[in-house]
A protein has these predicted regions:
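Class I SAM-dependent transferase core
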Residues: 1-36
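Conserved class I S-adenosyl-L-methionine
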Residues: 38-45
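Glycine-rich SAM-binding Motif I of class I
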Residues: 49, 53
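Conserved SAM-binding motif I beta-strand of class I
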Residues: 63-68
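Short alpha-helix immediately C-terminal to the canonical SAM-binding loop
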Residues: 74-75
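S-adenosyl-L-methionine
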Residues: 78-103
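A short acidic, Gly/Pro-enriched loop at the edge of an enzyme's catalytic core
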Residues: 102-110
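Mobile active-site "lid"/loop adjacent to the S-adenosyl-L-methionine
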Residues: 115-134
């Protein structure tokens, strides 16, 4: 098992996620503006849940929902949410964006996403990593 990624107020485990926490995700979480006091937030392709957790730490949003399509990443994201100080405001759905929109149909005050950036072939030997990159 890998060492968890520790922040001041929470810890993120990432040993089961294909895409690990990187500088871009941490910066996006820090730079995402919450000055308009969002009530509801959606994190698309949440991975470890890092963006949702950082927004929960920095805001008073009452509903922070994340969606993750990969089985292992979904389980790890859910565990990271459960183990956080904001577990009453965080929820992860195991679904694609299309499935989520068709089933839930809510609107959100803030939507965040940290898509992978690949200009050419994204395929690797790891199917979970390929899914996270696509």
């Amino acid at each position: 098992m890998e060492k968890p990624f520790k922040f001041k107020q929470f810890t993120v485990k990432q040993d089961r996620c294909a895409m690990k926490i990187g500088t871009d995700g941490v910066l996006l979480g820090a730079w995402t503006s919450v000055k308009h006091n969002p009530f509801s937030v959606l994190d698309i392709g949440s991975g470890t849940g890092i963006l949702s957790l950082m927004i929960a730490q920095r805001s008073h949003a009452e509903q922070i929902e994340a969606i993750e399509i990969d089985d292992d990443a979904y389980e790890q994201c859910s565990e990271n949410f459960e183990n956080s100080p904001w577990n009453d405001r965080l929820f992860c759905y195991h679904a694609s964006l299309l499935e989520f929109v068709e089933e839930v149909g809510d609107s959100f005050d803030l939507i965040v996403c940290n898509p992978p950036f690949y200009s050419e072939d994204y395929k690797t030997e790891n199917k979970s990593r390929d899914l996270a990159r696509f």
